[in-house]
Amino acid sequence: MLGLLGATTLMLVAGAPWVLPAGGADLRSPENVVVSIIDDNFILKWKSSSESVSNVTFSADYQITGMDNWIKLPGCQYVTSTECNFSSIKLKSVYEKTKLRIRAETGNSTSPWYEVEPFIPFQEAQIGPPDVHLEAEDKAIIINLSPPGTKNSVMWAMDSSSFVYSLVIWKNSSSLEERTKTVYARDKIHQLSPETTYCLKVKAGLRSPRKVGVYSPVYCINTTVKHHLPSPENLEINAENRVYVLKWNYTYENVTFQAQWLHAFLKKIPEDHSDKWKQIPNCENVKTTHCVFPQNVFTKGIFFIRVQASNGNSTSLWSEEKRFNTEMQTILFPPVINMKPINDASLRVGIGAPKESEDKSVNQLYPLIYEVIFRENTSDTERDVLEKRTDFTFSNLKPLTVYCVKARALIENDRWNRSSVFSDTVCEKTKPGSTSQAWLIAGILSAILLFPAVFYGVKVVSRCINYVFFPSSKPPSTIDEYFAEQPLKNLLLSTSEEQTEICFIVENTNTITTIEETDQIDDNHSRCSSQTNRDSGVYSNEDENSGSKIGEEILRQAAV
């Protein structure tokens, strides 16, 4: 094995030799000192500088950090060859810094010590090939791998379940058709042909710290004849509402199926886990090529699922195992959007959990971010933003304008891209901004100040219109002062309603009595006398009583 791994040997640069008095002048220190660590095998190699001296042996010491004294290196004392195996060294930890030194010896003479640069065994160790055991099926090969190192390995004691195995497989008849894949310590290679010879090799590696091992020797095996009852193929599992639906393909009829599941982490443990498979509820002895089971069968994590067909006493081989990640199957429902206007022409958006998420919010199970599409209602220009918050505000918007928003949930994980559909679009109108409010206040104040002036102007215009088109029936005061003080209401009376005054004529040659009656009829004066009153003697008079009294007084005077 060491010959196989010679290419991976580590070269440790030697330091300056630690010079001690030598017994012979021709005995020199070893050269080209090399330390090779593969798994738990520690090999020290060197080149002799005293080939001309016979009976030369070599001895080495080691020292660990914290030790004051040098200790003889086991397996490397009085060695006649140019290498030694010190795998039996009792190291407290493979993570401690270690020092080595070596010298040549012959008789009582010794060369100066040649001290090797200090090193940490784990950092310098190389990963050896795993042990490989193969079993054949008709269309598959079962692989059983043992991790590198010994059973009680000190070097890989903390990493035995962390190894990642890389396999290269090809048909023996054609090495050009190589296929490389990552496998577990207990795994199965599918999609092979029956009765065919396949060859493969495997190497192990660590991801942290990153270490890559060497390939194992090549192993070859023949697949068996085709099984009379084929295995189910093309397994597929999907989440629908609160259940999982497992489907597969099968060409034969009148068969029943059963499905089992296994925790994926068990695959990393290098041991037989065939008894760890468990039956899936509602997926036993089913006659259809699908089965439905509740989601609570699986907790959050990664699992493997396999299906087997049965026909009476005959059973098929297990199908190819389907890797199933519950996180990948989780259904993301669209979020619930709430938007309301706030001051200064801004809109506040709130994102809530959907009703379909039952009693647990989706973001309690997975870290979510939200893709938010925001736009003005009358515009096709959209603003696309990503938000981790469930409450945020869009500011500096146009006052009294309708804006619309919709959003979808995304799983915040670089390993996959999962998202929900977009939510329903929600639209809301912004409030007036501070500028609009200032203009509104200014407008109100201006209206209050201009109202008296407008009112006065309207009043003046109204008076002018009334004066021109609707003049007053009463004469102006300058004209009215020439009329009698008696009212003119009688002028408006009809003829039948006019008051009359009866005049009496008394003939007296010596005395002429003139009765003068003044009436205000159409602003003219009427007179009545004894000389001219030979007509009917009927006159209109406003005050009949006063006229009668005056007439009676005149008659009495005449009689006297």
Swiss-Prot record:
PTM summary from the entry reads:
Ubiquitinated, leading to its internalization and degradation. Polyubiquitinated via 'Lys-48'-linked and 'Lys-63'-linked ubiquitin chains, leading to receptor internalization and lysosomal degradation. The 'Lys-63'-linked ubiquitin chains are cleaved off by the BRISC complex. Phosphorylated on tyrosine residues in response to interferon-binding: phosphorylation by TYK2 tyrosine kinase creates docking sites for STAT proteins. Phosphorylated on serine residues in response to interferon binding; this promotes interaction with FBXW11 and ubiquitination.
Question: Which is an annotated GO molecular function term of this record?
Answer: type I interferon binding
Q: Lipid (S-palmitoyl cysteine) linked to which residue positions? A: 464
The Basic and acidic residues compositionally biased stretches are 550-560
Residues the record marks as carrying a glycan: 55, 85, 108, 172, 222, 249, 254, 313, 377, 417
GO cellular-component term (any): plasma membrane
Disulphide bond pairs: 76-84, 199-220, 283-291, 404-427
For the keyword Lipoprotein, the answer is: yes
Location(s) in or outside the cell: Cell membrane; Late endosome; Lysosome
According to its UniProt entry, the protein's GO biological process terms are: cellular response to interferon-alpha; response to lipopolysaccharide; type I interferon-mediated signaling pathway
Major place of residence = membrane
Signal peptide positions (record): 1-24
Q: Which residues are on the Extracellular side of the membrane? A: 25-437
The alphabetized UniProt keywords are: Cell membrane, Disulfide bond, Endosome, Glycoprotein, Lipoprotein, Lysosome, Membrane, Palmitate, Phosphoprotein, Receptor, Repeat, Signal, Transmembrane, Transmembrane helix, Ubl conjugation
**Any Pfam family hit:** Interfer-bind
The domain of life is Eukaryota
Q: Which residues lie on this side of the membrane: Cytoplasmic?
A: 459-560
Instruction: Give start and end of each Fibronectin type-III domain.
Output: 29-125, 133-224, 231-329, 333-433
Q: Does the keyword Disulfide bond belong to this entry?
A: yes
Quaternary structure, per UniProt, is: Heterodimer with IFNAR2; forming the receptor for type I interferon. Interacts with TYK2. Interacts with STAT1 and STAT2; the interaction requires its phosphorylation at Tyr-482. Interacts (serine-phosphorylated form) with FBXW11, the substrate recognition component of a SCF (SKP1-CUL1-F-box protein) E3 ubiquitin-protein ligase complex. Interacts with SHMT2; this promotes interaction with ABRAXAS2 and the BRISC complex. Interacts with TRIM10; this interaction prevents association between IFNAR1 and TYK2.
- In its UniProt entry, what is this protein called? Interferon alpha/beta receptor 1
